[in-house]
Amino acid sequence: LDDRQTLMLMDRETCHRIKRKDILYVETVGRCTCFHTAEGLFHSKEGLRIWQKKLDSSLFVECHKGILVHVRWIQSMEKDTILLETKETLPLARRRVETVRAVWKSFQEKYA
């Protein structure tokens, strides 16, 4: 993964630069998009669909309505839950299990 790939987020009056590889997951919270990273939370006024187009679909996959998970951080998957390496859990929609599993497997084969 290229560490130099960064995103610029506008959080009210502050501009934040975050590395894509440090994003654990992205979720919709109200009318904002929240980026969960190793360094903390960052918010953006742009919607999740806009960010989904900007993020690499081979790394970020929608695991549940309104949540994009970065597959590099997935530790394990169960029937309806994803466990991240940070020990956080995310919901996994039944209809998205196969897609998430396929993207995660592809990532493992390419980068692990």
Regions found by a protein language model. Give the residues of each.
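Eukaryotic intrinsically disordered, low-complexity regulatory linkers and tails enriched in Ser/Thr/Pro
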Residues: 1-14, 96-112
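Conserved binding/recognition cores within well-folded domains
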Residues: 1-85, 89-91
